[in-house]
Amino acid sequence: MYSLDDLLHLMNRLRDPQYGCPWDIKQTYTSIVPHTLEEAYEVADAIERGDFDHLQGELGDLLFQVVYYSQLAREEGRFEFAGVIDSITRKLIRRHPHVFPTGDLYAPLDVPQLSEEQVKQRWEQIKAEERAEKSDAPEQLSLLDDVPTALPSLSRAAKLQKRASQVGFDWPSALPVVDNVREELDEVLEAMAENDSAAIADEVGDLLFAAVNLARHLKVDPETALRGANAKFERRFRFIEQALRDTRRPIEDCTLEELDALWGEAKRQEKNMSSCG
């Protein structure tokens, strides 16, 4: 069975200027980013579908992205893969003092037990200290500085909101957020009445942001929830297509009422299957 060292050697061979792969040789940090995002989503997709037969391969594809960036950095004399492993190991030891109180990875497993809330508070404190260390002027730091701009918009909205909530800038419970969602929807309707396309886009953005806030207060991950909604829509629409294929009727010839009826049938069948399960 091949090892991590073999994968690193393979990556080095692929990037060999004389004998490597032309495609791999010309890649850069920036050109690989879309592939990295795609591989991460394929891992998430395999997990959500319960496709563990393919999960191992998808995790390998994602690991290869880390190896690729590390190879590029090694070629430029920045860091190596071993440094990546060392960095994350040190960070996790530092962030888990309740597990590694002495900072020794191999210390005896006899440590004081902390509550989940104590662990969470310590985790946030340590991350705040790490953010401060990244700046020469800690007093100018923003709590939002290290929220990646490249995150999917729903996830980034949730992270921005969570970060602000750490200093009390947050709704006290979910119910006021529901009212805020209604307010934002009303503002969308007002913009629609004025036929102001720029205002409509702005207000729809506010509505989405408020919906993410509601999800956060309900302890629902917005990206996961939306992926579930996407999967549900796809499943039901495929049901409509298959039902029409069975009757040899083009979907383009159907009225909206007929399509809605098939959509309702798809929902009923899902509900029946759920109750039987």
Report residues per predicted region:
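Flexible "arm" and connector segments at domain edges
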Residues: M1-E58, F64-V204, L208-G277
